[in-house]
Protein backbone atom coordinates (compact mmCIF):
# COMPACT_ATOMS: atom_id res chain seq x y z
CA UNK A 1 0.00 0.00 0.00
CA UNK A 2 1.74 3.16 0.90
CA UNK A 3 3.96 4.52 3.58
CA UNK A 4 1.33 6.79 4.94
CA UNK A 5 -2.22 6.08 4.11
CA UNK A 6 -5.02 8.02 5.67
CA UNK A 7 -7.47 5.34 6.55
CA UNK A 8 -8.68 6.59 9.92
CA UNK A 9 -12.38 7.35 10.24
CA UNK A 10 -13.54 10.87 10.91
CA UNK A 11 -14.43 11.71 14.49
CA UNK A 12 -18.00 11.52 15.73
CA UNK A 13 -18.19 15.22 16.47
CA UNK A 14 -17.54 16.21 12.88
CA UNK A 15 -20.22 18.27 11.20
CA UNK A 16 -20.25 15.95 8.22
CA UNK A 17 -23.36 13.86 7.66
CA UNK A 18 -22.97 10.12 7.28
CA UNK A 19 -23.25 8.52 3.87
CA UNK A 20 -26.42 6.78 2.80
CA UNK A 21 -25.45 3.46 4.31
CA UNK A 22 -27.06 1.29 6.93
CA UNK A 23 -23.77 0.63 8.63
CA UNK A 24 -21.96 3.00 10.97
CA UNK A 25 -19.65 4.59 8.45
CA UNK A 26 -17.69 7.77 8.29
CA UNK A 27 -17.10 9.67 5.12
CA UNK A 28 -13.57 10.14 4.09
CA UNK A 29 -11.91 11.11 0.93
CA UNK A 30 -9.25 8.96 -0.48
CA UNK A 31 -7.54 9.00 -3.72
CA UNK A 32 -6.64 5.49 -3.39
CA UNK A 33 -3.78 5.87 -5.63
CA UNK A 34 -1.44 4.81 -3.13
CA UNK A 35 1.20 7.05 -2.43
CA UNK A 36 4.55 5.90 -3.35
CA UNK A 37 5.42 7.63 -0.42
CA UNK A 38 8.41 6.15 0.09
CA UNK A 39 9.68 9.09 1.37
CA UNK A 40 6.85 9.54 3.09
CA UNK A 41 3.95 10.85 1.57
CA UNK A 42 1.22 8.69 1.96
CA UNK A 43 -1.51 7.57 0.15
CA UNK A 44 -3.42 10.25 1.47
CA UNK A 45 -5.08 9.79 -1.58
CA UNK A 46 -8.06 11.35 -2.61
CA UNK A 47 -10.96 9.36 -3.60
CA UNK A 48 -13.85 9.95 -1.35
CA UNK A 49 -13.88 6.93 0.83
CA UNK A 50 -16.60 5.72 3.07
CA UNK A 51 -14.96 3.78 5.88
CA UNK A 52 -16.90 1.00 7.50
CA UNK A 53 -16.02 0.36 11.11
CA UNK A 54 -17.87 -2.91 11.45
CA UNK A 55 -16.48 -6.40 11.03
CA UNK A 56 -18.12 -8.53 8.40
CA UNK A 57 -19.51 -11.90 9.26
CA UNK A 58 -20.32 -14.65 6.78
CA UNK A 59 -23.76 -13.50 5.63
CA UNK A 60 -25.82 -14.93 2.82
CA UNK A 61 -28.95 -12.90 3.43
CA UNK A 62 -30.29 -10.77 0.64
CA UNK A 63 -29.12 -13.13 -2.12
CA UNK A 64 -31.50 -14.29 -4.81
CA UNK A 65 -31.74 -17.88 -6.03
CA UNK A 66 -29.14 -17.45 -8.77
CA UNK A 67 -26.69 -15.74 -6.42
CA UNK A 68 -27.08 -18.48 -3.82
CA UNK A 69 -26.39 -21.09 -6.50
CA UNK A 70 -23.26 -19.24 -7.59
CA UNK A 71 -22.04 -18.97 -4.02
CA UNK A 72 -22.66 -22.67 -3.52
CA UNK A 73 -20.58 -23.39 -6.63
CA UNK A 74 -17.71 -21.31 -5.24
CA UNK A 75 -17.89 -23.17 -1.94
CA UNK A 76 -17.89 -26.52 -3.74
CA UNK A 77 -14.80 -25.63 -5.80
CA UNK A 78 -13.05 -24.39 -2.68
CA UNK A 79 -13.82 -27.57 -0.73
CA UNK A 80 -12.88 -29.82 -3.65
CA UNK A 81 -9.51 -28.19 -4.25
CA UNK A 82 -8.81 -28.03 -0.55
CA UNK A 83 -9.60 -31.69 -0.01
CA UNK A 84 -8.96 -33.58 -3.25
CA UNK A 85 -6.26 -31.70 -5.18
CA UNK A 86 -3.16 -33.89 -5.42
CA UNK A 87 -0.94 -31.24 -3.84
CA UNK A 88 -1.69 -29.64 -0.50
CA UNK A 89 -3.13 -26.17 -0.93
CA UNK A 90 -3.23 -23.17 1.38
CA UNK A 91 -6.81 -22.41 2.37
CA UNK A 92 -5.94 -18.76 2.85
CA UNK A 93 -4.37 -18.47 -0.60
CA UNK A 94 -7.33 -20.15 -2.27
CA UNK A 95 -9.69 -17.75 -0.53
CA UNK A 96 -7.58 -14.73 -1.36
CA UNK A 97 -7.28 -15.77 -5.01
CA UNK A 98 -11.04 -16.21 -5.30
CA UNK A 99 -11.69 -12.77 -3.84
CA UNK A 100 -8.94 -11.21 -5.95
CA UNK A 101 -10.54 -12.71 -9.04
CA UNK A 102 -13.96 -11.23 -8.24
CA UNK A 103 -12.53 -7.80 -7.53
CA UNK A 104 -10.36 -7.89 -10.65
CA UNK A 105 -13.44 -8.65 -12.74
CA UNK A 106 -14.79 -5.22 -11.75
CA UNK A 107 -12.03 -3.66 -13.87
CA UNK A 108 -11.97 -0.84 -11.32
CA UNK A 109 -8.50 0.39 -10.30
CA UNK A 110 -9.91 1.74 -7.04
CA UNK A 111 -11.47 -1.49 -5.80
CA UNK A 112 -9.29 -4.14 -4.20
CA UNK A 113 -8.94 -6.80 -1.54
CA UNK A 114 -6.21 -6.43 1.08
CA UNK A 115 -4.76 -9.12 3.31
CA UNK A 116 -4.43 -8.47 7.04
CA UNK A 117 -0.80 -7.48 6.54
CA UNK A 118 -1.67 -5.13 3.70
CA UNK A 119 -4.54 -3.66 5.72
CA UNK A 120 -2.19 -3.00 8.63
CA UNK A 121 0.19 -1.27 6.27
CA UNK A 122 -2.73 0.67 4.83
CA UNK A 123 -3.83 1.88 8.26
CA UNK A 124 -0.44 2.66 9.71
CA UNK A 125 0.93 6.13 9.94
CA UNK A 126 -2.29 7.96 10.59
CA UNK A 127 -0.10 10.71 11.97
CA UNK A 128 3.55 11.40 12.50
CA UNK A 129 6.63 11.05 10.35
CA UNK A 130 7.23 8.62 7.53
CA UNK A 131 10.15 7.39 5.50
CA UNK A 132 9.78 7.34 1.75
CA UNK A 133 10.15 9.49 -1.34
CA UNK A 134 6.88 11.39 -1.08
CA UNK A 135 4.98 10.48 -4.22
CA UNK A 136 1.43 9.26 -4.31
CA UNK A 137 0.74 6.43 -6.74
CA UNK A 138 -2.19 4.56 -8.20
CA UNK A 139 -2.61 1.48 -10.34
CA UNK A 140 -4.64 1.66 -13.52
CA UNK A 141 -4.69 -0.67 -16.51
CA UNK A 142 -1.86 -2.72 -15.00
CA UNK A 143 0.33 0.40 -14.84
CA UNK A 144 1.63 2.21 -11.78
CA UNK A 145 1.43 5.97 -12.17
CA UNK A 146 2.14 8.97 -9.97
CA UNK A 147 -0.88 10.95 -8.84
CA UNK A 148 1.16 13.73 -7.32
CA UNK A 149 4.54 14.24 -5.67
CA UNK A 150 4.37 15.77 -2.23
CA UNK A 151 5.52 19.36 -1.89
CA UNK A 152 9.25 19.60 -1.07
CA UNK A 153 9.51 15.80 -1.00
CA UNK A 154 12.48 13.87 -2.40
CA UNK A 155 10.23 12.80 -5.29
CA UNK A 156 9.38 16.40 -6.21
CA UNK A 157 12.98 17.52 -5.83
CA UNK A 158 14.11 14.68 -8.09
CA UNK A 159 11.71 15.81 -10.81
CA UNK A 160 8.88 13.29 -10.45
CA UNK A 161 5.69 14.70 -12.00
CA UNK A 162 1.97 13.86 -11.88
CA UNK A 163 1.03 11.19 -14.44
CA UNK A 164 4.57 9.80 -14.65
CA UNK A 165 4.33 6.04 -15.20
CA UNK A 166 6.64 3.91 -13.06
CA UNK A 167 7.82 0.93 -15.10
CA UNK A 168 10.69 -0.31 -12.91
CA UNK A 169 11.94 -0.02 -9.34
CA UNK A 170 15.65 -0.66 -8.94
CA UNK A 171 15.62 -2.10 -12.47
CA UNK A 172 12.92 -4.68 -11.65
CA UNK A 173 9.74 -4.43 -13.71
CA UNK A 174 6.60 -3.46 -11.81
CA UNK A 175 4.19 -3.82 -14.72
CA UNK A 176 1.21 -5.86 -13.55
CA UNK A 177 2.41 -6.03 -9.94
CA UNK A 178 0.02 -5.19 -7.07
CA UNK A 179 0.33 -1.60 -5.89
CA UNK A 180 1.24 -2.60 -2.33
CA UNK A 181 4.09 -4.73 -3.64
CA UNK A 182 5.44 -1.82 -5.65
CA UNK A 183 5.27 0.42 -2.60
CA UNK A 184 7.25 -2.14 -0.60
CA UNK A 185 9.89 -2.12 -3.33
CA UNK A 186 10.16 1.66 -3.14
CA UNK A 187 10.23 1.93 0.63
CA UNK A 188 13.40 1.48 2.63
CA UNK A 189 15.67 2.97 5.24
CA UNK A 190 16.27 6.68 5.55
CA UNK A 191 19.30 7.81 3.61
CA UNK A 192 19.25 4.92 1.14
CA UNK A 193 18.52 5.34 -2.55
CA UNK A 194 15.89 3.92 -4.85
CA UNK A 195 15.93 4.15 -8.63
CA UNK A 196 12.62 4.58 -10.44
CA UNK A 197 12.37 4.06 -14.16
CA UNK A 198 9.65 6.45 -15.22
CA UNK A 199 7.90 6.84 -18.53
CA UNK A 200 6.83 10.33 -19.53
CA UNK A 201 5.27 10.55 -22.93
CA UNK A 202 7.04 7.93 -25.04
CA UNK A 203 10.40 8.19 -23.27
CA UNK A 204 11.80 6.33 -20.28
CA UNK A 205 14.43 7.51 -17.82
CA UNK A 206 15.99 6.34 -14.55
CA UNK A 207 15.60 8.73 -11.63
CA UNK A 208 17.61 8.08 -8.47
CA UNK A 209 15.92 9.30 -5.29
CA UNK A 210 17.20 9.42 -1.72
CA UNK A 211 14.71 8.17 0.85
CA UNK A 212 14.05 10.49 3.75
CA UNK A 213 11.71 11.18 6.65
CA UNK A 214 8.67 13.23 5.77
CA UNK A 215 6.48 15.16 8.10
CA UNK A 216 3.38 16.38 6.35
CA UNK A 217 2.05 19.75 7.43
CA UNK A 218 -1.59 20.25 6.62
CA UNK A 219 -1.60 24.03 6.18
CA UNK A 220 1.32 26.41 5.65
CA UNK A 221 0.98 30.20 5.62
CA UNK A 222 3.29 32.77 4.07
CA UNK A 223 2.79 36.50 3.60
CA UNK A 224 3.72 37.67 0.10
CA UNK A 225 3.41 41.44 0.08
CA UNK A 226 -0.27 42.23 0.53
CA UNK A 227 -1.35 38.69 -0.34
CA UNK A 228 -1.47 35.68 1.97
CA UNK A 229 -0.48 32.33 0.45
CA UNK A 230 -1.95 29.34 2.27
CA UNK A 231 -0.62 26.02 1.02
CA UNK A 232 -2.96 23.13 1.84
CA UNK A 233 -1.03 19.88 1.47
CA UNK A 234 -3.80 17.45 2.35
CA UNK A 235 -7.19 17.18 4.02
CA UNK A 236 -6.57 15.56 7.39
CA UNK A 237 -8.07 15.87 10.84
CA UNK A 238 -8.34 19.57 11.78
CA UNK A 239 -7.17 20.94 8.44
CA UNK A 240 -10.17 23.26 8.53
CA UNK A 241 -9.16 24.41 12.03
CA UNK A 242 -5.61 25.11 10.87
CA UNK A 243 -6.93 27.04 7.88
CA UNK A 244 -9.21 29.09 10.11
CA UNK A 245 -6.31 30.03 12.36
CA UNK A 246 -4.16 30.98 9.37
CA UNK A 247 -6.93 33.17 7.92
CA UNK A 248 -7.45 34.93 11.25
CA UNK A 249 -3.69 35.52 11.50
CA UNK A 250 -3.56 36.89 7.96
CA UNK A 251 -6.54 39.15 8.65
CA UNK A 252 -4.81 40.62 11.71
CA UNK A 253 -1.81 41.37 9.49
CA UNK A 254 -4.02 43.39 7.18
CA UNK A 255 -4.22 40.75 4.44
CA UNK A 256 -7.41 41.04 2.40
CA UNK A 257 -6.58 38.67 -0.46
CA UNK A 258 -5.54 35.06 0.02
CA UNK A 259 -4.36 32.34 -2.32
CA UNK A 260 -5.32 28.79 -1.39
CA UNK A 261 -2.65 26.65 -3.02
CA UNK A 262 -4.05 23.15 -3.64
CA UNK A 263 -1.49 22.04 -6.20
CA UNK A 264 -0.50 18.38 -5.79
CA UNK A 265 -2.99 17.98 -2.94
CA UNK A 266 -4.32 14.42 -3.38
CA UNK A 267 -7.25 14.85 -1.01
CA UNK A 268 -7.99 13.22 2.33
CA UNK A 269 -11.01 13.52 4.59
CA UNK A 270 -14.26 14.55 2.97
CA UNK A 271 -15.69 16.06 6.13
CA UNK A 272 -12.68 18.38 6.31
CA UNK A 273 -13.35 19.53 2.75
CA UNK A 274 -16.94 20.30 3.79
CA UNK A 275 -15.79 22.13 6.93
CA UNK A 276 -13.22 24.05 4.93
CA UNK A 277 -15.89 25.17 2.48
CA UNK A 278 -17.98 26.25 5.49
CA UNK A 279 -15.29 28.81 6.34
CA UNK A 280 -16.37 30.70 3.21
CA UNK A 281 -19.92 29.45 2.55
CA UNK A 282 -22.78 30.21 4.94
CA UNK A 283 -24.91 27.68 6.82
CA UNK A 284 -27.35 25.41 5.00
CA UNK A 285 -25.67 25.31 1.60
CA UNK A 286 -24.79 22.10 -0.23
CA UNK A 287 -21.07 21.45 -0.58
CA UNK A 288 -21.20 18.08 -2.33
CA UNK A 289 -23.84 15.69 -3.66
CA UNK A 290 -23.50 11.93 -3.24
CA UNK A 291 -25.29 9.57 -5.62
CA UNK A 292 -25.75 5.80 -5.67
CA UNK A 293 -28.30 4.80 -8.24
CA UNK A 294 -31.49 6.61 -7.29
CA UNK A 295 -30.27 7.31 -3.76
CA UNK A 296 -28.98 10.83 -3.24
CA UNK A 297 -27.63 12.78 -0.30
CA UNK A 298 -26.33 16.30 0.07
CA UNK A 299 -23.64 17.30 2.54
CA UNK A 300 -24.32 20.84 3.70
CA UNK A 301 -22.57 23.52 5.71
CA UNK A 302 -23.67 23.65 9.35
CA UNK A 303 -22.33 27.02 10.54
CA UNK A 304 -22.11 30.59 9.35
CA UNK A 305 -19.01 31.49 7.35
CA UNK A 306 -15.96 32.85 9.18
CA UNK A 307 -16.27 36.61 9.63
CA UNK A 308 -12.65 37.29 8.67
CA UNK A 309 -13.01 35.19 5.51
CA UNK A 310 -15.94 37.32 4.36
CA UNK A 311 -13.59 40.32 4.24
CA UNK A 312 -11.19 38.59 1.88
CA UNK A 313 -10.92 37.91 -1.81
CA UNK A 314 -10.00 34.29 -2.47
CA UNK A 315 -7.98 32.77 -5.30
CA UNK A 316 -7.50 29.01 -5.60
CA UNK A 317 -4.46 27.56 -7.35
CA UNK A 318 -4.74 24.00 -8.71
CA UNK A 319 -3.00 21.61 -11.10
CA UNK A 320 -3.30 18.06 -12.40
CA UNK A 321 -2.20 16.76 -8.99
CA UNK A 322 -5.17 18.34 -7.19
CA UNK A 323 -7.63 15.53 -6.60
CA UNK A 324 -10.76 14.35 -4.85
CA UNK A 325 -11.22 16.34 -1.62
CA UNK A 326 -9.31 19.17 -3.27
CA UNK A 327 -11.79 19.02 -6.13
CA UNK A 328 -14.79 18.85 -3.78
CA UNK A 329 -13.65 22.06 -2.09
CA UNK A 330 -12.67 23.78 -5.34
CA UNK A 331 -15.92 22.76 -7.04
CA UNK A 332 -18.02 24.17 -4.21
CA UNK A 333 -16.08 27.44 -4.06
CA UNK A 334 -16.36 27.79 -7.83
CA UNK A 335 -20.08 27.01 -7.98
CA UNK A 336 -20.87 29.56 -5.24
CA UNK A 337 -18.57 32.15 -6.84
CA UNK A 338 -16.57 32.41 -3.63
CA UNK A 339 -13.22 32.17 -5.39
CA UNK A 340 -11.54 32.49 -8.74
CA UNK A 341 -9.67 29.36 -9.79
CA UNK A 342 -6.23 29.60 -11.41
CA UNK A 343 -3.72 27.10 -12.74
CA UNK A 344 -4.37 24.00 -14.81
CA UNK A 345 -7.10 21.35 -14.99
CA UNK A 346 -7.40 19.17 -11.88
CA UNK A 347 -6.99 15.39 -11.70
CA UNK A 348 -10.64 14.36 -12.05
CA UNK A 349 -11.49 12.00 -9.20
CA UNK A 350 -15.21 11.90 -8.54
CA UNK A 351 -16.04 8.52 -7.03
CA UNK A 352 -16.78 7.33 -3.52
CA UNK A 353 -15.48 4.14 -2.01
CA UNK A 354 -16.30 2.00 0.99
CA UNK A 355 -13.90 -0.15 2.98
CA UNK A 356 -15.13 -3.08 5.04
CA UNK A 357 -12.91 -5.01 7.38
CA UNK A 358 -13.19 -8.74 8.06
CA UNK A 359 -12.70 -10.35 11.46
CA UNK A 360 -9.27 -11.65 10.40
CA UNK A 361 -8.04 -8.12 9.75
CA UNK A 362 -8.28 -8.26 5.96
CA UNK A 363 -10.28 -5.67 4.08
CA UNK A 364 -12.17 -5.08 0.88
CA UNK A 365 -12.42 -1.67 -0.75
CA UNK A 366 -14.91 -1.01 -3.50
CA UNK A 367 -16.45 1.92 -5.33
CA UNK A 368 -19.92 2.56 -3.98
CA UNK A 369 -21.07 5.94 -5.25
CA UNK A 370 -20.08 9.08 -7.09
CA UNK A 371 -20.02 12.71 -6.05
CA UNK A 372 -21.07 15.89 -7.83
CA UNK A 373 -20.48 19.58 -7.19
CA UNK A 374 -23.32 21.72 -5.76
CA UNK A 375 -24.43 22.64 -9.29
CA UNK A 376 -24.41 18.99 -10.32
CA UNK A 377 -21.14 18.82 -12.24
CA UNK A 378 -19.64 15.32 -12.42
CA UNK A 379 -15.89 15.79 -12.71
CA UNK A 380 -14.70 12.17 -12.76
CA UNK A 381 -12.19 11.73 -15.56
CA UNK A 382 -12.69 15.36 -16.56
CA UNK A 383 -11.33 17.44 -13.73
CA UNK A 384 -12.16 21.06 -12.98
CA UNK A 385 -11.00 23.66 -15.47
CA UNK A 386 -9.61 26.87 -13.94
CA UNK A 387 -11.20 30.24 -14.60
CA UNK A 388 -7.78 31.53 -15.59
CA UNK A 389 -5.18 29.17 -17.01
CA UNK A 390 -1.59 29.58 -15.87
CA UNK A 391 0.64 27.29 -17.85
CA UNK A 392 3.57 25.50 -16.33
CA UNK A 393 6.83 26.57 -18.03
CA UNK A 394 7.78 24.31 -20.92
CA UNK A 395 10.94 23.12 -19.23
CA UNK A 396 8.95 21.79 -16.25
CA UNK A 397 6.86 19.45 -18.39
CA UNK A 398 9.41 18.13 -20.85
CA UNK A 399 9.52 14.47 -21.76
CA UNK A 400 12.52 12.69 -20.34
CA UNK A 401 15.41 11.99 -22.68
CA UNK A 402 16.53 8.33 -22.67
CA UNK A 403 20.01 8.01 -21.19
CA UNK A 404 20.93 4.90 -23.17
CA UNK A 405 21.80 6.87 -26.28
CA UNK A 406 24.36 9.56 -27.16
CA UNK A 407 23.18 12.31 -29.51
CA UNK A 408 25.51 14.02 -32.01
CA UNK A 409 25.43 17.01 -34.34
CA UNK A 410 23.47 16.33 -37.53
CA UNK A 411 20.93 13.99 -35.95
CA UNK A 412 17.22 14.56 -36.30
CA UNK A 413 15.25 13.42 -33.26
CA UNK A 414 12.31 14.69 -31.21
CA UNK A 415 14.51 14.59 -28.10
CA UNK A 416 16.70 17.27 -29.65
CA UNK A 417 13.82 19.72 -29.25
CA UNK A 418 13.71 18.84 -25.55
CA UNK A 419 17.43 19.61 -25.24
CA UNK A 420 16.94 23.00 -26.86
CA UNK A 421 13.99 23.99 -24.66
CA UNK A 422 15.84 22.89 -21.53
CA UNK A 423 19.14 24.57 -22.33
CA UNK A 424 17.34 27.78 -23.29
CA UNK A 425 15.57 27.74 -19.92
CA UNK A 426 18.96 27.32 -18.25
CA UNK A 427 20.21 30.46 -19.97
CA UNK A 428 22.15 29.09 -22.92
CA UNK A 429 21.86 30.78 -26.36
CA UNK A 430 19.26 28.80 -28.31
CA UNK A 431 17.07 30.58 -30.86
CA UNK A 432 15.05 27.68 -32.30
CA UNK A 433 13.16 24.63 -31.08
CA UNK A 434 13.55 22.33 -34.07
CA UNK A 435 14.39 18.64 -33.77
CA UNK A 436 17.65 19.04 -35.69
CA UNK A 437 20.93 18.79 -33.75
CA UNK A 438 22.60 21.88 -35.23
CA UNK A 439 25.86 23.73 -34.58
CA UNK A 440 24.20 26.13 -32.17
CA UNK A 441 23.03 23.26 -29.98
CA UNK A 442 26.44 21.63 -30.07
CA UNK A 443 28.02 24.92 -28.98
CA UNK A 444 25.49 25.32 -26.14
CA UNK A 445 26.16 21.75 -24.98
CA UNK A 446 29.90 22.38 -24.95
CA UNK A 447 29.41 25.47 -22.79
CA UNK A 448 27.04 23.54 -20.51
CA UNK A 449 29.57 20.72 -20.17
CA UNK A 450 32.34 23.17 -19.36
CA UNK A 451 30.18 24.96 -16.77
CA UNK A 452 29.46 21.66 -15.04
CA UNK A 453 32.93 20.08 -15.13
CA UNK A 454 31.96 17.47 -17.70
CA UNK A 455 33.97 16.17 -20.63
CA UNK A 456 33.61 18.82 -23.33
CA UNK A 457 32.76 17.13 -26.62
CA UNK A 458 29.46 18.71 -27.71
CA UNK A 459 27.68 15.36 -27.58
CA UNK A 460 24.59 14.83 -25.46
CA UNK A 461 25.73 11.70 -23.60
CA UNK A 462 24.53 10.03 -20.39
CA UNK A 463 26.52 12.22 -17.99
CA UNK A 464 25.41 15.35 -19.81
CA UNK A 465 21.83 14.10 -19.75
CA UNK A 466 21.95 13.44 -16.00
CA UNK A 467 23.36 16.89 -15.24
CA UNK A 468 20.86 18.48 -17.65
CA UNK A 469 17.98 16.86 -15.74
CA UNK A 470 19.49 17.79 -12.39
CA UNK A 471 19.83 21.46 -13.35
CA UNK A 472 16.28 21.69 -14.69
CA UNK A 473 14.88 20.16 -11.50
CA UNK A 474 17.02 22.52 -9.44
CA UNK A 475 15.67 25.50 -11.39
CA UNK A 476 12.07 24.34 -10.99
CA UNK A 477 12.46 23.88 -7.23
CA UNK A 478 14.15 27.24 -6.79
CA UNK A 479 11.53 29.40 -8.47
CA UNK A 480 7.78 28.81 -8.36
CA UNK A 481 6.95 30.48 -11.66
CA UNK A 482 3.26 29.57 -11.58
CA UNK A 483 2.72 31.13 -8.14
CA UNK A 484 4.76 34.17 -9.15
CA UNK A 485 2.63 34.56 -12.29
CA UNK A 486 -0.51 34.48 -10.16
CA UNK A 487 0.90 37.01 -7.69
CA UNK A 488 1.68 39.31 -10.62
CA UNK A 489 -1.86 38.94 -11.96
CA UNK A 490 -3.26 39.95 -8.58
CA UNK A 491 -1.26 43.17 -8.36
From Swiss-Prot:
The chain crosses the membrane at residues 31-51. It is an enzyme of class 3 (hydrolase). Residues 119-201 form the PDZ domain. The active site is at 324 (charge relay system), 335 (charge relay system), 349 (charge relay system). One of its GO terms (molecular function) is endopeptidase activity. It is a single-pass membrane protein. CDD domains: cpPDZ_CPP-like (cd06782), Peptidase_S41_CPP (cd07560). It is found in: Cell membrane. GO terms for cellular component: outer membrane-bounded periplasmic space; plasma membrane. NCBIfam families: prc (TIGR00225). This is Probable CtpA-like serine protease. It comes from Staphylococcus epidermidis (strain ATCC 12228 / FDA PCI 1200).
